[in-house]
Amino acid sequence: MAIKKTYRVKRSKDFDQIFSAKHSFANKRFVVYKLNTNQPHFRVGLSVSKKLGHAVLRNRIKRLLRHAVAEFKPYLVDEDFVIIARSGVETLSFEEVKKNLRHVLKLSKIYVDGEND
């Protein structure tokens, strides 16, 4: 399961717009910034700092995040958001990444599934 390029935030200008909106939500593993837009679908940007490890490890984290977002796709609202990985995420399994990411996305009201957990 992959995310099409139209679902990704790629340009620096777009990242800056999302960060300048100052709507941020965080848990121990991730920070999410969001921006309400008039897009027909959501767009996601990923940010993994060099402090988290070498390129292979950072790319693994981004792959896990993209896969988790692809699984969450039916539950995501039509907004732009950026996910920033915090230290400690490099040791998590895919299931732990999904759990932590779902938690922070629910806090930000980006993930909506109708369940109260």
Curated annotation (Swiss-Prot):
InterPro entries, A to Z: Ribosomal_Su5_D2-typ_SF (IPR020568), Ribsml_uS5_D2-typ_fold_subgr (IPR014721), RNase_P (IPR000100), RNase_P_CS (IPR020539)
Superkingdom of the source species: Bacteria
EC number: 3.1.26.5
Keywords: Endonuclease, Hydrolase, Nuclease, RNA-binding, tRNA processing
Catalysed reaction equations from the record: Endonucleolytic cleavage of RNA, removing 5'-extranucleotides from tRNA precursor
One Pfam family recorded for the sequence: Ribonuclease_P
Keyword Ligase: no
Gene Ontology biological-process annotations: tRNA 5'-leader removal
Membership in a protein family: Belongs to the RnpA family.
Subunit structure: Consists of a catalytic RNA component (M1 or rnpB) and a protein subunit.
Protein name per the record: Ribonuclease P protein component
Organism the protein comes from: Lactococcus lactis subsp. cremoris (strain MG1363)
Species classification: Bacteria, Bacillati, Bacillota, Bacilli, Lactobacillales
Gene: rnpA
